[in-house]
Amino acid sequence: MAPPSYSDLGKQARDIFSKGYNFGLWKLDLKTKTSSGIEFNTAGHSNQESGKVFGSLETKYKVKDYGLTLTEKWNTDNTLFTEVAVQDQLLEGLKLSLEGNFAPQSGNKNGKFKVAYGHENVKADSDVNIDLKGPLINASAVLGYQGWLAGYQTAFDTQQSKLTTNNFALGYTTKDFVLHTAVNDGQEFSGSIFQRTSDKLDVGVQLSWASGTSNTKFAIGAKYQLDDDASVRAKVNNASQVGLGYQQKLRDGVTLTLSTLVDGKNFNAGGHKIGVGLELEA
């Protein structure tokens, strides 16, 4: 099995702090699939403070015999997105994709060509922004050996003829434990730990620090599976922000998520946030 992409390193710990929380939002997600294999994913949310409503529609169709995937997206900002991807055709583990964005109101448009390759001990990704003035080239690679992972991510601006990103990562992963450390541009240092302590309890820890500042961030979170249909989540950071979440499967294809964010430093001042999410799948 190939290692994860650079962007997915430490994902298990990040999911502990991000999934199951919808602070300050009323959120609705709907997923469905036709008999012909076309997937529809509709999402929308309303910001409780600003009242702004945002929605998106995604359609995806796969031609399995040719490893072809066609994806189209539209959102209420009137932005159109299209992607054509081919996987495992020219070479096992190789994925080629071409994507484009277009905003009719502003006339802004851009395209990107992506290449991804995964093998037993290596995962490499690269994309080129299609720009006549000079493309921006992003590339990353992750090497894996006996649970150890080492990754590098870079970006090259052809207009300025210089590297704009230099990120390094090192980690170790097992079935129930994931350690991830990273250095971004030699200035930002971060680390995370994910531990599955039992079949029902997952725990995560995150730490980050930026050189030249005294701004250190620390957070600890957990997810506990009450039963097959219900789970609770909790997280707290060094800013005394406490997040709580509860997720309940009401029936097949219907899941309700409730969450709240409490400011521990200003508990009596109010300003705490709640979130409600409903997921429907048919």
Swiss-Prot record:
What protein family is recorded? Answer: Belongs to the eukaryotic mitochondrial porin family.
Query: Where is this gene product found?
Result: Mitochondrion outer membrane
Q: Where is this site: Involved in hexokinase binding?
A: 72
How it assembles, according to the record, is:
Interacts with hexokinases.
The protein's name is: Voltage-dependent anion-selective channel
Result of changing residue 19 to R:
Poly-KR; increase in apoptosis when overexpressed in muscle cells, resulting in wing posture abnormalities
Q: What is the lineage of its organism?
A: Eukaryota, Metazoa, Ecdysozoa, Arthropoda, Hexapoda
What InterPro entries does the database record attribute to this sequence? Answer: Porin_dom_sf (IPR023614), Porin_Euk (IPR001925), Porin_Euk/Tom40 (IPR027246)
What Gene Ontology cellular component terms go with this record?
mitochondrial outer membrane; mitochondrion; Nebenkern; pore complex
Molecular function (GO) terms for this protein are:
porin activity; voltage-gated monoatomic anion channel activity
* Classification via Pfam families: Porin_3 (PF01459)
Q: Which GO terms describe its biological process?
A: mitochondrial transmembrane transport; mitochondrion organization; monoatomic ion transport; negative regulation of apoptotic process; negative regulation of calcium import into the mitochondrion; phototransduction; sperm individualization; sperm mitochondrion organization
- The organism named in the record is Drosophila melanogaster
Enter cross-link residues for Glycyl lysine isopeptide (Lys-Gly) (interchain with G-Cter in ubiquitin): 11, 19, 52, 109, 273
Gene behind the chain:
porin
